[in-house]
Amino acid sequence: MESLPSLLESIYTTWLSLSSTIWAMDMILAFVCGLGLYHLLLPFLESHLSSPPSNIKFTRKPQIQMTWQSQFKKKFRNHCRNDAKAWGECLKKLKEKEKDKLFLEEMSPGHHLNSLGNIFNSSSAKQDSTTLSPFWNLKEKSEEQVATQKLSYPKISEDHFQQKCDQLFWGLPSLHSESLVAAAWIPQTTSTLPSPFFLFNVISSVYPIQLQDKMSPMLPHTHPLSYLDLQSPHLILSPLEFQTPALNLPVLLPSSLPYNSDFGTSYSQSQSKPQYLPTEIKYNKKPSLAKQIENRSTLPLMVQKPQEAYDILAPNPSQDWVVSILPDNFPICRELREKLEQHIQKWLIQHQWNFPHKIQVSEKMKELQNTVIGNCQTRDKPGTLQALGEHSNEGQKRKFQLEKESGKNLGPILGKISKDPIRGLEKTTAIKDLENNLKAHLGTKSGQIDQGLTPLSMRQSWLAVDDSFYEMENNLTSLKSSAKSMCSSEKLAFLKPETRQALEAHIVRFWAKHRWSLPLKILKPVKLFQLSIESLPVVLCAQTSSTTSVHRTRSAAEVVRFLGKPCLRQMIIEDSSPSPQNLLLVSSPSCKRARRRLPFGVDHEPSTALPTKPECGHISEDLTYNFMNTTSQTRTIFKKEIETREVVLLPRRTSDQNLEAYKHQEKVVSEFPHNVETELAGQPQIYTTTVLPPKRSRSMPLPVDTLTSHVLGDIVVADMDNSLVQQRPSTPKHLVSQKSQIKMLAPTYQSEGTKRQSEIKYEDRPKLTPVTEKKANFGSQYYQTLPKIAQVLPGRPPQRHLGRFLQWIHPKKTIKGHEFHPLKGNPTAAIVQNQRRQVRKIPYMDNNVTEAQELMTTVGQMLEKKMMLQHQPYASKFNQHREVPPAPMSRFSHGHMPVSYLQQRRAPSYPGSCSCQRCSVQNRHIRNQLPQRSVRFSKKPQNPRNPSHKKPQNPRNPSRLSRNAALNLVNSQNRTIVPGNSNHHLYCPRHCALQRDVCRELGHSSVVFPNRKT
C-alpha cells in the first residue's frame, strides 16, 4: 500500500514538471479518443434505449445506414439550397428510392430468414401482446409504428406473385432454387399481429410463435397449412393449436417440417396418416418456444430412410380430395392459386418420385407402406418438448396429442387413387394382357412354322432336328433339352396344348441347331468328313413301296447315340420302272425330312431342268422323287446355280438280266476338288457338289426346295443285290468362281479299251494334204500332251493351274481318247452316248471366246496396216524391175541350208516367238472361224518349182519354222507368197525376230512388192 501512493506522487510531479506544449498535446489526444469512442458507442446507445441488448447485432447495421443517409441529406441540402426547384425534384426522387429500397429489403428472403431465426428470443413472459418483438425494428421508426406494423402492399405483393407464378409456369426457376415467401398479409384489425411467413423451401430450426390476446382469423383451423419438401413424400399438415387459458396461437410443430440441407437439420415424426397436431400449452413462470420429440431427438433425418422419416400414404384413402396446398388467405387471386398448386403438384410428381403424371402404386410399395406404418404406430407416442434458444431451461412443457383425420393427404398430387384398391388387380390385368399378346404372337408364329415361312435360321434348326423331335413326340426317346423345355412350358400353362407343344418343339430344334451346326469352313477338310462317315452306320432301307417307312423305322437308340452328331436327312428316290425294289438312298448330314410340317404347294417352287454339258449327258429314264408324299416328274439333271445345292441323278438300270456282267467302278475327279463324280457300270450316276448357302436375310421366307438342299455334305449309298457302295463325301470349295461352278465334270481318265479305239480311229484316217496334215499334227501334238498334265494335277499345284488355264482356253475341245465308250450290251449307256453326241453338235459360245475373237481381229488389222506401211517403199521399184534375177539364197530353198545358219537364225527368233506362240495357243480354238488371209503379189499364181517341199515335215523339228520361211522366200521369186501353214499365226514383226529376218532377206533380194490386196 505504501508503494502505490508514492507511485502516484511521482507520476503527478512528473506530469506537472512537463512543459505546457506536452500538456496541450495530451489534452488534444484525450479529446480525440473520447470523440472516437462516442461515435463507436453511439449506435449501441441508441439501440439500447429501444431494445434489449440481445438484438443489438440486428439493429446496428440499419442504424449506421440511416446515420449515413442523414449526413448525405444534410450535405445535399447545403449543396442545393440555392436552387429551390432542383432541391424539390431531388427530394422527391430520394423519397421514392427510400420507399422502394425499404420494400425490397422487407421482401428479401434474407430479411425474413433473419427475422425467423430470431423470433421471440426475449425472456419476458409478460410481454405486451400489442407490441412486436424488438427485432422488427430494422429501420429508424418509432416504437408505435413498429407495434402496429402492417404489410400495406397488397397490390405490389400480388404483382410479385404474378411474376413468380409465370416463372414457375414456364419452368424458368426451379422450385428448389426459389423461396416463395408470403410477404403480404392483410390483417382484419389493427390490433392483430401479422401472420408468420410461409416458406416453401426455407426451413429454420426455430419457428415463430406469436402471443396475442385473440386468435387471428387469417388461418382458420379448417384449412391445413402445407409445408412441402423437395426430397421426400409431402404432407399437408394443419397448424398446431396452442391451448392456453388466455390465448390460442397457430404453432407449427418442428417434427412436421421436412429436412432441408440448405438451412439446417430438422426432425420429423413418422405418422400413418397426415395429422392435425393440436397441442396443449401449460404455462409456467416463463414461456418456451418449441420442443423436440424425445423418441426421435437422437436421430437426424439424414440417417433415416425416406420411407420411415416421412409420412406415407394410407392404403385406404378416402374420397375427400378437396384439400388446398396453399392457405385460403394467401394474398393471390384464385387463378394464380390454381396455377401455383398445379405447378407444385407437377414438380413433386416429377422430382420426388421420378414417375410420370399418372402414378400407379405398385404392390411392393403398398407392402412397404404397411410395414412402415406398423412400425411407426408403435413408436409414435405423446412426448414432451424441450425448449430451444437462450431460455430453454425455463421453457414450458407442452403435451402433444396425435389426432387422426382422414381426407387430408396427397390425393390431388397422386391423381386420386381409388378408395379401396384391390391388391393384385393391376398385376392380374397386366398379366392377362401379356398372356393375350403372347398367345396371339405364338399363334402367328406357329402358323408360319407350319407353312414353312419361318426365317432361315429357324428353318435350319427345324430341319436339323426334325427326325429326333419326331421320335421324342412318340416317346421313343428323351433328349437332354426336353427337361429344359418342360420347365419353361410349366410357366406358360395358360397357352393351348397345341401352341405349347409347337413352342417346345421349336425350343428343342433351336437348342440342337446351336449344338450341332458347324460352319462350312470347319467341314472343309476331307478327313473330317471321313471321320463323321465312319462313325455313322449305313442305314439299310427295307424294300417296300411306302416311302415313309424308312423314316419311321429308325430306332430310338440311334437318336440317343447320335445326339452329339447331326442326324441324316433321308430322301427316297424311286424309279418309275415296273420293278419298285431298286431304291436309292441319298442322305446328307445337316437337313431333315420336312414331310410332317410343310404341305405341298405352300412355298414349293417347280424344279426346272437345265441343259448340262455334253460330258455329263442326259437322263434317259424318268425318276420319281418321293418327298413329303408328293411326286414330281423330271427327265433331266436337277441343276441349280451357285446359290443352291446341286444333286444330279442319272438313271439306273431297271433290268436284272445282265447285272452280274458288270463291275462296280468308282471314279473321283480330282481336277475340281469341290465336285465328286461316281460312275457305276450299269448303275445310276450321282454327282454331288457342295456350295455355300445363299446370303439372304434372316427374316426372308425361303422355299423348301432351296432350303432342303442346303446341306454340309452328301453320302451316296447305292442299293443293288444287297450290296452297298459308299461314296466319299465331297469337299466344299468356297473360293470357286460362278463360271467354274456351272461347268460340269469332264472325265480325265480313260480305260484301255477307249485308248485302243482312239488308236484305231487314228489309223483309219484318210490321207491329208500337206497344209491340213500340218494342222492335224499340231493339234494332235497339243491334245496328246493334255492328259499327261491332267493326270498329275492333284500332286502338282502349278500344273493343276496350267490345266485349268488350258481348259478355260478350250472349253469346246474334247480330249481325244477320253470319251466314255460304253460296253456292248448296255443300251442305257448307248442312249446316253447318243444324247451326248447330239449335244456336241449344239454350238456353244463363251464370253471369253467372243472377246478373244474381237481382240485377235483388231490385232490382225493393226498388223496388216503396219506391213503395208513397211512395204510401201518397194512399190516404186515394181515397174522398173519386171524380171527378178535369181537370188543368192536360192540354193538353200531345196533343203540344203547349212545347219549353222539355221541355228544362227533360230536362236534370236526363239525368245521373240514364245510370247506370240503363247498368244496363239490361247486363241487356237477359234482359228477355223477367223478368215485365212494370203498375200499375193501377182494375179497369176504359179506352183513352186521344187515339188519336194510338199512332203509333210515333222512338227517337232525345231527348224520347221525357218524352212517354211525359206519356202516362202523361194515362192516370192515367182511373185507369189503362200504361207506354209494356212492356219499358222502370223508372227508380230515387233516381237518376232524371225519375221524381221525374212523381211530383211526380201529386201536384199531386191524383190519389189506390188500393192497388196486382201
Swiss-Prot record:
Membrane topology category: Single-pass membrane protein
Transmembrane segments: 22-42
Protein location: Cytoplasmic vesicle, Secretory vesicle, Acrosome membrane; Cytoplasmic vesicle, Secretory vesicle, Acrosome lumen
Region (Disordered): 925-961
One GO process term, biological-process aspect: cell differentiation
SS bonds (residue pairs): none
Example of a GO cellular component annotation carried by this entry: acrosomal membrane
Family classification: Belongs to the SPATA31 family.
Quaternary context: Interacts with ACTB and STX1A and/or STX1B.
Cited function: May play a role in spermatogenesis.
Protein known as: Spermatogenesis-associated protein 31
